[in-house]
Amino acid sequence: MKLSRFGKKFSALSGIGQLMEDLGQAMAQGDMIMLGGGNPAHIPEIEKVFRHSMEAIMQKAGAFESIVGNYDNPQGNAAFTEALARLMNTNYGWNIGPENIALTNGSQTAFFTLFNMFAGESEDGKRRKILFPLAPEYIGYADLGLEADTFTALKPEIEFLDAPFFKYHIDFDRLQIDDSIGALCVSRPTNPTGNVLTNDEVQKLTALAREAD
């Protein structure tokens, strides 16, 4: 059996794969307190809401059968995306509709799609990258690019606080967004350090991205 480049890349050992395998093995060996890996805590109040909703689905005629047996819109369940748009508009003052929302099978799938939409070879022959304006970043991003050299990053400015604490910031003096950059990506809070970009930093990034678009 001969694999394509895609097949070799996605069947190879990856950082996020090792991390999730380690977490899975740890959970299988007994009670553990999950502090990362996407499972930070079981919150009884939230689980109670989910349980109540699941019970309501099971009791409603045809609802369970529809979920397990009917295809939804590729964008996501229409009723759910409409409800989610209303929630965002009501709670955050946004002005979006269902057409602005797409559902995926988790964040890895979402970022795989986004990264490869904006990075790689374009129709004009130009190769563009995803820029992380702050590093270190989430290990799970590393293997999501279909092409080599999908990502580039900028070293941070480090602010030393009272020992032993420090905080790192975007080095805007060195940040350049030219035609080789397809998109910016930041985690807030940053994984794995928990560093949070300030509102001012986010606004500056947004302005720079608009200028470069």
Region annotations inferred by a language model:
Residues 66-212:
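Conserved core of the PLP fold type I
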